[in-house]
Amino acid sequence: MTARLAPVWAAFLGATALVAGSTQSGLAADVIKFGISTPLSGPAAPWGIPHKNATELIFDEANAQGELDVNGKKYKLEIVAYDHKYVIAEGVATVNRLIAKDGVKFLSILGGAVVKANEETVNENGVLNLPLAYAEGLVSPKNPLTFHSFPAPPETTTFWKWIKEHHPEIKSVATIAPNDDTGWWSIKIETNFVQGLGYQVAAKEFFERSVTDFNPVLLRILAQKPDIISVNASPAGSVGLIIKQARELGFKGRFIHIGQVDTSVVANISGKANVEGMWVHGYVQNPLPEQVKSWQARYTEKYGEWNATSIDFANPAFAFVAAVKKAQSLDPKKIAEALHTVEFDNLWGKAHFGGKDYYGIANQIIYSMPFSEVKDGVATLVAQLTPPYN
């Protein structure tokens, strides 16, 4: 097949690759290459680094256990990872390179705006994509080979019911999010949901990802006197600055991120006390189930320091390995068929792909989602909730 690729050559030539194992292009007789396009530098690196590392660790462990058996033949799993810096042009360039130069047929892309920019390329080249991304229309019948591997706002907004039950004093919500596909859709879903629960939406603001001075936006938000500020879809670097500057302007309320954010990174920027009481999805430091403690030890041994974001960002690799085993094929379409039926273990328990009633296709990962509250500087698990559909 001739790859159809977008012509973003300046970014293409500037892309930096990290390759685990063999550097041969294409699929060697005994190698399955898995492409990763993710931010390994910049404000979103606290997402991208554990995304790459978690995938690499799971593949290394599968290889050490005898590699992946497909119809009696052993295959070694390898990753080819590129840094897109959460810049759309870089994201397009890295995916182009993975498909055309590296010959990968299996991908995991992080970032809604980046995934949306690559939809056509992924679909036309018949590539299986297991992204970590928020964007409207991403999980859709028009993207049959895209299996979203992290809970999205239609799933995670259910935590607002928990808040309403446990903290009835909170009445008004303000939101601040990136000015792109990821931010627009995330806030649209979240604000519609909270309004349905009776909350007042005091303000909705968007920012460019390069912004570091949030005071003008925050002054508009704080003038509306919200009880809580949602920073959904915002990366840790931006969230730290938002919280720091909001506190300096006198905001005393809570913050919430029902996407995913590393609160330790946020606290290093904003100050530990300023993050106290924040609620987050998908980032837990304590208490950890036994299987997560084991993962923590293995991850720390390999990479030198622990990163709790890796817990949920391991999902694409878990899903891929389970589906290949079930499909007994390296055909992306057959692996996709297997993903519709296979139940697999992730670090929080059992997971599968579902959500057909909501999305029109069963391509959204479903599992018991962890939510935490920062208490004494530690992201402490307060609830595990199931999505509103199966």
Tell me what each language-model feature is.
Residues 15-26:
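C-terminal segment of classical bacterial N-terminal signal peptides
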Residues 35-58, 82-88, 111, 176-184, ...:
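Extracytoplasmic "Venus flytrap"
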Residues 1-12:
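Bacterial N-terminal signal peptides that target proteins for export
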